[in-house]
């Protein structure tokens, strides 16, 4: 007997009113992840994944483009309010927050969660150009 074709169910996106934008700004790249309050990832984007390669990945503009892409994906969940957590010393810290604000999100608060070592690992040697 022939198998009946099963219909692929359309995945229903859950509606989330407010979430958390995690920004990881390193010296080489910027990663933007938008999660719900429980920490489940809704959308993410990187400067490298946005078409920037090499040293252009580590620019504020690349971080801005990554934030805009991530914001567009997060809008599908009906997100309105964002809490921003910034981590890292990279050049895309401020431009990412500005881009999320310009994308139409209401930013409730900004937290700097940069890990500071209590004399942990030895830092990289100074550059000689």
Swiss-Prot record:
Keyword Ribonucleoprotein: yes
PROSITE patterns: RIBOSOMAL_S11 (PS00054)
Record-level Gene Ontology MF annotations: rRNA binding; structural constituent of ribosome
Domain of life: Bacteria
Gene Ontology cellular component list: ribonucleoprotein complex; ribosome
Record keywords, A-Z: Ribonucleoprotein, Ribosomal protein, RNA-binding, rRNA-binding
Gene Ontology biological process terms from the UniProt entry: translation
Function: Located on the platform of the 30S subunit, it bridges several disparate RNA helices of the 16S rRNA. Forms part of the Shine-Dalgarno cleft in the 70S ribosome.
Similarity comment text for this entry: Belongs to the universal ribosomal protein uS11 family.
PANTHER family reported in the protein's UniProt record: 40S RIBOSOMAL PROTEIN S14/30S RIBOSOMAL PROTEIN S11
Known partners and oligomeric status: Part of the 30S ribosomal subunit. Interacts with proteins S7 and S18. Binds to IF-3.
Name assigned to this protein: Small ribosomal subunit protein uS11
Organism for this UniProt entry: Vibrio atlanticus (strain LGP32) (Vibrio splendidus (strain Mel32))
Lineage of the organism: Bacteria, Pseudomonadati, Pseudomonadota, Gammaproteobacteria, Vibrionales
Gene: rpsK
